Amino acid sequence: MSVSKTNRIALFIDGANFYATTRTLGLDVDYKRVLKEFESRGTLVRAFYYTMISEDQNYVSLRPLVDWLVYNGFTVVKKVAKEFVDSAGHRKVKGKLEVELAVNAMELAKHIDEMFLFSGDGDFRSLVEAVQRRGVRVTVVSSFAAQPPMIADELRRQADAFIDLDTLRTKIGRDPSTRSM
């Protein structure tokens, strides 16, 4: 594949969905290698990472990753999860970042040629279609190889291209001998 450095690209990583997919695949992601891999595909305009944080834990477990991402070129979009107790007395966490991701994608569409959406969530099908109408090529990065598949069929069909995360294992997987993010 011939890649032009004038191809302006942006990454949109749905953190919760990406984490679930990589965990299902047993893939430990090295985010430095993610940047390197996608910078080789064009001029990286922006790399977004979307994540929920818990009110009571102040995102202690996510803090090292979030800090590393911020200091290494990612735009991290955080939202506090709303916690509640359902009618059965079970503690539930509610909150999504689909709207924030969609707004950022629509705003950035006029500045990019290609969007890489790291999510398998079918709720993004309409967003993909809207961005395509603005002349942006959309590649969805998720997994059909995972069991169960982590990509909604309608999202995969709408995208211009699909990359299975399993095929990127050697390019973005963490080298066990290193400790970088």
Give residue ranges: language-model regions:
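Domain-level signal for Mg2+-assisted phosphodiester chemistry and nucleotide/NA-binding surfaces
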Residues: 1-97, 107, 122, 137, ...
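Short loop/turn motifs at secondary-structure junctions
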Residues: 43-45, 111, 158
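Conserved residues at the C-terminal ends of beta-strands
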Residues: 50, 118, 165
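Acidic, metal-associated active-site segment
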Residues: 101-111
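Active-site histidine-anchored catalytic micro-motif
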Residues: 110-153
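Ligand/cofactor pocket segment of small-molecule handling proteins
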Residues: 153, 157, 161, 166
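A charged, well-structured terminal subsegment
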Residues: 164-181
